[in-house]
Amino acid sequence: SYALEAFRFMVSFATSLAMVENRIFIGNGNIISLILQDEILHKDWTAWLINQVVKEDPRFAEAKVECEAEVYAMYADVIREEKGWADYLFKFGPVIGLNAAILKDFVDYTAVGALKDIGIKYQGTAPKSTPIPWFMKHVDTSKKQTALQENESTNYVIGVMSDSLDYDEL
């Protein structure tokens, strides 16, 4: 579901990748980056699908309006749980460059974009820019510079989605 791919595990992804940023568990971090990239692809595909169904079927467009508060409440619950997970992970203190407050801001920042992608306005407060600037280099495969013999190739994800696909082409 969209909540799973857009919000759930983002705190864990960021925490795990903070270790990589601190030159710890680099091998695991590379695998986690691949999993993160896969989740982002799923999120983008699911957002596209939600938007297409709403655009092409008036019944779904009507249902979206009728159920918006209920749908937002579901996403808000997941967001609240992710913030609780950040508090739990850092109850004994921060790691270099990361703490619960930064992660909770990151959850809010991520929520704004993810909800906007499906036509829902985030009702919380969020920073205007990412509180974890290094996170995107783990999402964007074009920013990785590794020799193929040193890492798995992530080229398979380039060009797999098109937002110009028409329903009849499917």
Model features per residue range: what roles?
Residues 1-170:
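Non-heme di-metal
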